[in-house]
């Protein structure tokens, strides 16, 4: 009768991507922030996750990391296919 409330849900792809991003950022912080080698790997992983749900070009994902003395900012831009169609209309 109550068996349904004890089932574990499979994490969504968004949750999995969020967890991976948190791990990457924690690793980047612990390395002193001097190693931007994770950015191409992050870009590839994001592209793979988005491609599971829609068809996008390889250059559709842009990842930028900006740093100041007390703040790091990660910007991720993904150009979605329907955005291209809207521009043409």
Curated annotation (Swiss-Prot):
Disulphides: none
Protein known as: Cell division topological specificity factor
Origin: domain of life: Bacteria
Protein species of origin: Paracoccus denitrificans (strain Pd 1222)
HAMAP family, per the entry: MinE
Function of the molecule: Prevents the cell division inhibition by proteins MinC and MinD at internal division sites while permitting inhibition at polar sites. This ensures cell division at the proper site by restricting the formation of a division septum at the midpoint of the long axis of the cell.
Lineage of source species: Bacteria, Pseudomonadati, Pseudomonadota, Alphaproteobacteria, Rhodobacterales
InterPro entries in alphabetical order: MinE (IPR005527), MinE_sf (IPR036707)
Family: Belongs to the MinE family.
Pfam family of the protein (one): MinE
Any GO BP: cell division
Keyword tags: Cell cycle, Cell division, Plasmid
């Amino acid at each position: 009768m109550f068996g349904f409330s004890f089932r574990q849900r499979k994490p969504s792809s968004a949750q999995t991507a969020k967890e991976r991003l948190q791990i990457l950022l924690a690793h980047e912080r612990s390395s002193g922030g001097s190693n931007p080698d994770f950015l191409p790997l992050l870009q590839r992983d994001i592209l793979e996750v988005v491609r599971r749900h829609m068809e996008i070009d390889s250059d559709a994902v842009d990842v930028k990391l900006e740093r100041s003395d007390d703040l790091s900012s990660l910007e991720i831009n993904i150009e979605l296919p329907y955005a291209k169609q809207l521009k043409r209309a």
